[in-house]
Amino acid sequence: MKKIKIFLMMLLAVLSFTACDDDDDSKQSIISEYSMNDQQVAAQKAKSGKDKAVLLVAFGSTWTNAFAAFDDTKKAYEDAFPDADVYFCFSSDICINRASAGEHGESRNYYEPRYLLHAIGAAKYKTVYVQSLQVSPGEELADLVAAVQKFA
C-alpha cells in the first residue's frame, strides 16, 4: 500500500510540473497577430486616406476556388463602397489555420475578426461596417456579434 501511495504521489508531482508550462509563446503570437494587422490596416488607411471601413466576415474555406469567390466578393464590395477600405477575414479558426498552411493549394493568411476590428479601431476609422457572409447562424456568428459589441 505504501509503494502505491508513493507511486501516485510521484506521478502526481510529474504531471503537475508538466502541466505548469509557461504560455509565453501563445501570448507572443497573439501580440504579433495584433501588431501585424495594426500595421497593415494603418498602412492601407494612410495610403487611401479614407475614414470608412467595411469588414467582411466569412466562415472560411481552404479551397482555391473558394478563395477566388472571396476575392470576387471583396472586389464587389470595393466597387459598391468606393469611399471605404474593405477588409476580409475568416471566423473559423480551423479554416484560418488550414488556409495559412496551404492545405488545398495556395497559402493565404486570414485573421479573426477581433484582430481586424482592433486594427481598424487603432487606425481611427470614423465609420465601420461589419458584414457577415455566414450562410447559417452558428457559433462563429455569435462570436462575431460579441466581438463587434466589445469593439463598439
Sequence positions of predicted segments:
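Active-site-proximal alpha-helix that buttresses catalytic centers in soluble enzyme cores
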Residues: 21-152
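Bacterial N-terminal signal peptides that target proteins for export
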Residues: 1-8
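C-terminal motif of bacterial Sec signal peptides marking the signal peptidase cleavage site
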Residues: 15-19
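Short, linear, compositionally biased motifs with a strong N-terminal bias
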Residues: 10-13
